[in-house]
């Protein structure tokens, strides 16, 4: 998070305007501008654990991570700077939450890349904080308005669900596979062997569909699920509960909060972080897996066929297998043996 994003660079063109402001930063916080911008006071709220990790090192308790912001998270703020995400329902969840807490009269800035759909902020906030475009640069738009009316926010109304082969999947905005089981996960599930036993870690669990599907035909597995996303963590907990499956679910930046070793690690790792393409999480997953697998344990991941994971798998484990593939996806398996680097 050292370099500033285009959205932050647009904000820096107006840095003098923020020196006397008490600012709440929220949304898709891809850099550490909230910790570095000269303001009267700064807070940050994020639903992304890895963004909170970076910001909390510099901002301490003024950086908060949770699904839903609370009154304490916005205390004494007179300005909101919201970074528009690529997911419109995610923006609606977060903005309705934040605007329901901030006092009338709060200055509202919304910034984002044009390709993210930031211009739809005008329509979304029209009844609460009418926005005007005040700058356009770096293929981004910056919008300003003042909060005239607080919306009513009910997080429960944002929940959704769908069924997959008799399983109930609970979802929230921004959670991967929110609208149905993706093709990659289907391919990975097709490779899982019934009656598997042992400890299984699902990294980047999303809505928890991989874990509950695995548990249905392998009820003796002991599940641990983690994700960087607060909505994903809550969705996975709800999915497990809806299907009467037990498991531990928590927020983690890949393995940052994971303790112990497992017999299998499964994942459909992301290769985007917000609007940006990033292979960091998947490469961290592969390289770090050797520190969290028992001897003979297995890493099994699905990925777009064009992504350069075979080299990292071979470098880390000494070898890998492709156990299923389509034109778009491959399922990779690597076994923890003496050949594997011990991290």
Swiss-Prot record:
It catalyses: guanosine(1207) in 16S rRNA + S-adenosyl-L-methionine = N(2)-methylguanosine(1207) in 16S rRNA + S-adenosyl-L-homocysteine + H(+). CDD domains: AdoMet_MTases. SUPFAM superfamilies: S-adenosyl-L-methionine-dependent methyltransferases. Pfam families: MTS, MTS_N. It is an enzyme of class 2 (transferase). Its EC number is 2.1.1.172. This is Ribosomal RNA small subunit methyltransferase C. It comes from Shigella boydii serotype 4 (strain Sb227).
């Amino acid at each position: 998070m050292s370099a500033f994003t285009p959205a932050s660079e647009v904000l820096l063109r107006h840095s003098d305007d923020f020196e006397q402001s008490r600012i709440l930063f929220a949304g898709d916080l891809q850099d550490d501008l909230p910790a570095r911008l000269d303001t009267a006071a700064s807070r940050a709220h994020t639903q992304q654990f890895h963004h909170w990790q970076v910001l909390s090192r510099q901002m301490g308790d003024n950086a908060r991570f949770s699904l839903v912001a609370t009154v304490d998270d916005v205390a004494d703020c007179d300005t909101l700077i919201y970074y528009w995400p690529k997911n419109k329902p995610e923006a609606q969840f977060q903005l309705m939450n934040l605007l329901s807490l901030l006092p009338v009269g709060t200055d509202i800035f919304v910034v984002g890349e044009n390709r993210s759909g930031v211009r739809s902020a005008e329509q979304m906030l029209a009844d609460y904080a009418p926005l005007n475009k005040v700058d356009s640069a770096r293929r981004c738009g910056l919008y300003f308005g003042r909060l005239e009316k607080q919306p009513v926010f009910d997080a429960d109304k944002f929940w959704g669900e769908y069924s997959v082969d008799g399983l109930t999947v609970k979802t929230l905005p921004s959670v991967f596979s929110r609208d149905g089981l993706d093709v990659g996960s289907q391919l990975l599930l097709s490779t899982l062997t019934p009656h598997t036993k042992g400890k299984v870690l699902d990294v980047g669990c999303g809505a928890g569909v991989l874990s509950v599907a695995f548990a249905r035909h392998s009820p003796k597995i002991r599940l641990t699920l983690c994700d960087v996303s607060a909505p994903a963590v809550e969705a996975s907990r709800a999915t497990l509960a809806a299907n009467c499956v037990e498991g531990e679910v928590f927020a983690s930046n890949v393995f940052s909060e994971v303790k112990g070793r497992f017999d299998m690690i499964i994942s459909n790792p992301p290769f985007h972080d917000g609007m940006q393409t990033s292979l960091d999480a998947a490469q961290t997953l592969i390289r770090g897996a050797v520190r969290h697998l028992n001897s003979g344990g297995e890493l099994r991941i699905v990925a777009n066929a064009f992504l350069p994971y075979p080299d990292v798998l071979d470098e880390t484990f000494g070898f890998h297998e492709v156990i299923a593939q389509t034109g778009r996806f491959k399922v990779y398996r690597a076994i923890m043996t003496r050949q594997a680097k011990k991290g």
